[in-house]
Amino acid sequence: MIEGISFASFVTHEKPKFVRALDFYKALGFLPTKEYKHGTDHHATDEEGAGSIQEVWLTSSRAGVPSVTVKLRLSRHGNEHVSLPNLKHDWRSLVPSLVYYAPDLDAVRAAITPFLHEDHSTLLERPSHTNFIELYAIDPMGNLVGFSRRENPYSSAMQKPFSADDIGPQNFSKPNETKIKGKKRIGVMTSGGDAPGMCAAVRAVVRAGIARGCEVYAVREGYEGLVKGGDLIEPLSWEDVRGWLSLGGTLIGTARCKEFREREGRLAGALNMVKNGIDALIVIGGDGSLTGADLFREEWPSLIEELVTNGSITAEQAERHRHLDICGMVGSIDNDMATTDVTIGAYSSLDRICELVDFIDATAQSHSRAFVVEVMGRHCGWLALMAGTATGADYIFIPEAAPDATQWAEKMTRVVKRHRSQGKRKTVVIVAEGAIDSDLNPITAKMVKDVLDGIGLDTRISTLGHVQRGGPPVAADRVLASLQGVEAIDAILSLTPETPSPMIALNENKITRKPLVESVALTKKVADAIGNKDFAEAMRLRNPEFVEQLQGFLLTNSADKDRPQEPAKDPLRVAIVCTGAPAGGMNAAIRSAVLYGLARGHQMFAIHNGWSGLVKNGDDAVRELTWLEVEPLCQKGGCEIGTNRSLPECDLGMIAYHFQRQRFDGLIVIGGFEAFRALNQLDDARHAYPALRIPMVGIPATISNNVPGTDYSLGADTCLNSLVQYCDVLKTSASATRLRLFVVEVQGGNSGYIATVAGLITGAYVVYTPESGINLRLLQHDISYLKDTFAHQADVNRTGKLLLRNERSSNVFTTDVITGIINEEAKGSFDARTAIPGHVQQGGHPSPTDRVRAQRFAIKAVQFIEEHHGSKNNADHCVILGVRGSKFKYTSVSHLYAHKTEHGARRPKHSYWHAIGDIANMLVGRKAPPLPETLNDEIEKNIAKEQGIIDPC
């Protein structure tokens, strides 16, 4: 059962421990091969301990695998093993450990369970007790023994990477198993319209393919390159795609090819693939490109037969290329593909639109003008809807929600006039290029301008055009492209002739595979439904998030300072307070909560400057929020009502007094881990203070993304975008000076989320997190890796490199210390510099993703208060509103606090994102780091050598 390369000697002077340890290792599958007792005729050899009362040697081995030998010694003077003072935390580094390879950890756990303490405190499963790849236990003699699915934890060989299918909440299990039959040649192409993130996708495909033992060929200029062949089809090496992660567009070119639509063109493409030995194709493009790819696969057998018949290829070549494997990745800024929540390029395009509309706002505000902004989206209004939400547009026109042909102008002018009457100086209307009315007549930007001119507004048209496609991809697109690229390779390697062509999708925050043909067919159904005036069906075919976002936009847009548009049964008084460090999206959440509350007839109050502000300033810290003051907040960073790290424990009695005095019916707390703690303190105080027995809901907002009960927090995406821009500039500088490494310190507290994801999207060569820690052996391993990498890239471009270190990954190995050690060890072969972005990571303007999420969070929070107001079941009245996949979930704070939180580390016990680090390492070629080893390990080894005890190497 166990494989390894170690020889270990364990000593004790207690006979019961010796006997129980013997049973322990026998249960693991070790067999006694040698036994020695003092006083028998047998004489101890040099290998055997002369001072032993009894020795038993146990060995476990398999054919072709080096044996593992454990020598148990009963001695008059056994070693005293280090005690473990606190078994509630990760105690692996407190004593020396011996780690074995064990492919079946469930069997190992079952075998050693009878030897554990009743509370299982001597067992540690990592990274979690449900999904573990390492298992540590304390044997009866007090030795720490580990078991790992990794074949050799101390080896420098690259461990098998995790599949991208493992990335996603509640989906962290075994890596996707692929069957590689021979060395496969895989072609990759980009086709149709370009999209930001395509280069990152190609990079991931190339490097994942090489890591999986494949050869990857670029088919340049899309299907045109496939038809023409020659130099347009060429192999890509690992180094060829260096630096592509941050580039916009596609460096392998794209084109729309009429020839490929005809069979003769596809026949030429088949011939060129056979000539180059390519038997699989990954196509990155829109629905038209993917449709062509699947047709190509469907016709492949007949194309090969025709090529044999006309003598273009031999029968032997035909036999080697009997089947063609196709995999699709959707690259489209419109986000118009069914069965996936988002497509590569959509987030970046949305970011461009929102940035430009933010700029337009300044001039519109100055001149009190109206602007009509036309964005892309021929059959899909995703860009227009999300941009309208993120920028606080007055009105939007999208194809799926076509307005009445005779009333749309009147409805729009009514909304615009209402907003102007409430004091708003600017008007922004966003029009999708495919916008139509209920009679399928186009609604153009010019038509909207004419209507606005008719009510006396000075109106301008801004058509954004191809600016929406340009620029580097944002953080979300880099993550999506990288994970989907890895999954595309795995999909290709696991396909059979009977398997339908897959399309790589994102569903519920999981990378998934969907049937390509069905996905394209559903996409076309949306256009058909719109063409048939069945707009309800068109909306049904969109994902639920799209529908919910549209409803949220309409509700917040209908807010009126004087008259509620959708009055609730019971008007409520709702308080909003921010706690902890500022994060992008806080203001957007405040805005959406207030606008939704006003639309429902509620009174919305801000508690300024957190809990300490309420205690110190009393009624002066509480102020009712108006429509006009919150309306422009969606674009602003920071926190307009003030925030700090004070908690209710500063004076619970005074806080309860003011809650009672203000007659609050509900509370929304926006913030990070401090908000979580604040809610727990308020929840615990309910029994003493009746004024606190109201519905309370927490909206997670922190760049650390460390709030239990949610996969995402507001501000994390803004932080990642800030880091992407910062690190891209650093890499440019490092590349210009050639052999330079920047050691970048990132925030995140005790959560490695930001460092891990930033490592993936910036192409960092090394990432250190609090979860993995830093030690001398690991640092030595990584410095050696960096030296080798720089040596191989001394004369090439784009050689700038990054090392990311979370601010709390080590108290000893600080950013400056690591930089100094690297410079000393590099001996002038390269140099290292320190870069600390600090609070720049909190970002300026929040990202569109954080703005859009903020609206959904805020509306759900107010709805929770509406639903639970007046209920007597206080147990479920205090919750964290979290995102699981793409769905929102309310979770009791008391449950999270008691069962799901590492309080000392201020983070959840389980997180979905850990496997991203393995994929990031694979994509930069970082070899598997050694297991952590403390200085105590080195001391123990030296003592063992002096005593003649053979210690595992």
From Swiss-Prot:
Q: Which residues bind beta-D-fructose 2,6-bisphosphate?
A: 645, 702-706, 740, 747-749, 807, 833, 839-842, 906
Cellular compartment(s)? Cytoplasm
Catalysis performed (reactions): beta-D-fructose 6-phosphate + ATP = beta-D-fructose 1,6-bisphosphate + ADP + H(+)
Region annotation (C-terminal regulatory PFK domain 2) ranges: 573-953
SUPFAM superfamilies to which the protein is assigned, alphabetical: Phosphofructokinase
Q: Which GO terms describe its molecular function?
A: 6-phosphofructokinase activity; ATP binding; fructose-6-phosphate binding; metal ion binding
Give the binding site residues for ATP. G193, R256, C257, G286, D287, G288, S289
- Active site annotated at which positions? D334
Family indicated by similarity: Belongs to the phosphofructokinase type A (PFKA) family. ATP-dependent PFK group I subfamily. Eukaryotic two domain clade 'E' sub-subfamily.
Name of the molecule in the record: ATP-dependent 6-phosphofructokinase
Gene designation per UniProt: PFK1
